[in-house]
Amino acid sequence: MSEKTNAAKVWLEQNGISIDQKPVIILCGSVFYFRIPRALWQDRLNKLKEAGYNCIDVYIPWNYHELVEGGWDFSGERDVEAFLQMAVEAGLWIVARPGPYICSEWDGGALPAYLHTYRGMRIRDNDPFYLK
């Protein structure tokens, strides 16, 4: 994100989690910016907060941002930075779940289609070419 923020100190304690030395119960909901029109992002985040949640988890699908090899797009509906900033402003913690592979009933697990054009590459494997 473009602004520097103070990161919270998260500790796993014997009886739970503490954040900045305070015991916390994490209530987390999944909010996927890539399935919601940008105009509704703030509304959905606010509703989650109003329902008592204090955290979101969000996938960041690789193939949503890199449609063609080397062609990254983080504008408009793909502006994940703006989405994450809205979550922070709503008072929500974030569990970011970037690819390369995601579940969430997403085509190809969010792996870019161009990967299938490379002969001999074994996808989702220890293949050095894939890992590069």
Where are the predicted features?
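N-terminal carbohydrate-binding accessory modules
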Residues: 1-55, 85, 93
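Active-site region of glycoside hydrolase catalytic domains
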Residues: 3-7, 13, 89-92, 102-132
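The substrate-binding groove and active-site-proximal loops of carbohydrate-active enzymes
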Residues: 26-37, 62-79, 117-132
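Aromatic-lined substrate-binding rim segments of carbohydrate-active enzymes
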Residues: 42-115
